[in-house]
Amino acid sequence: MSLVSYPRSESESDIEEETPLASKSFDPTLFQHARRKLSVDSTKKSPKRLKRQVDLQKSSFNDKTFNESDVISNERFKSNDLLELLPAPKNQAELAPKSSKRSDLDLNENYLLPNNSVSDLTSTGSSETVKKSTYSEKSGNVSLFNIVGSESKQASLVDSDQKPYQPILIKPKARANPPKLRNQPENDFISIANHSVHSNAEDINIINEDYIEIGRHRKEKGRIIDVDINKLPKPTQEALPSAPTIKSVAPGRHQLSSLVEMAISQKDNFEAYFEQQRSNKKASSQKYGF
């Protein structure tokens, strides 16, 4: 297989397609699923369709010097359009452009092509360029985001006979039967009896001694008790013997001699502390049974 591809002429490719295979010693049933060989006539259109297109081009050109051979030769080398490849619309519906949501443009008028554009369409062979040109000519000075309108639209909106704006205010409606106000006389009031703590106590039949304990009796004096602070009973925690204080050893390295001296100096405190712990243990065992 060569890596270099040489260009071939159109005559050579046609000859190669039409020449039959040299060897016919193979079984034809083995190649049932092979690709079908394209013939030259398969790209041609039907005569009825070709004749119809020639008539359309004749009516569009309106020229006496019209050669059918040029149209036929162009149709042979022309590729299939997208509309020819797609299936026909359902119920023969017309494929019209969708209506635009914009209020400042009228696309239906822009899509209508003039009579002169038919000849341009057949000569160029593309309808999109004609639509774009007519759309740009008819649209004029149109803003992209509809912020500033065209001059013609602004002139049409302004009317000389237009009346000035008068705001309409919604007024509350008057009631058919308004509520009547009653005039209250000056002497029309309810007398309230004077209630006090003493009157309430008499109603409940509370003794004066109980009343003094419940609340203050303004007419009678309360009981005054002289208390000596120094003779007050001490709490139970203070009555218990206090535990001897033992100095703790400071953190860090220490010599053995310094630790022994500290323990000897606090010998009495250690003995008192151990004795207190034993007595607490005996008292708790007698009280709680363990």
From Swiss-Prot:
One of its GO terms (biological process) is mRNA cis splicing, via spliceosome. Its main location: nucleus. The keyword Nucleus applies. One of its GO terms (cellular component) is spliceosomal complex. Disulfide bonds: none annotated. Residues 1-61, 114-134 are annotated as: Disordered. It is found in: Nucleus. The keyword Nucleus applies. Residues 114-128 have a biased composition (Polar residues). Involved in mRNA splicing where it associates with cdc5 and the other cwf proteins as part of the spliceosome. This is Pre-mRNA-splicing factor cwf20. It comes from Schizosaccharomyces pombe (strain 972 / ATCC 24843) (Fission yeast). The lineage of its organism: Eukaryota, Fungi, Dikarya, Ascomycota, Taphrinomycotina.
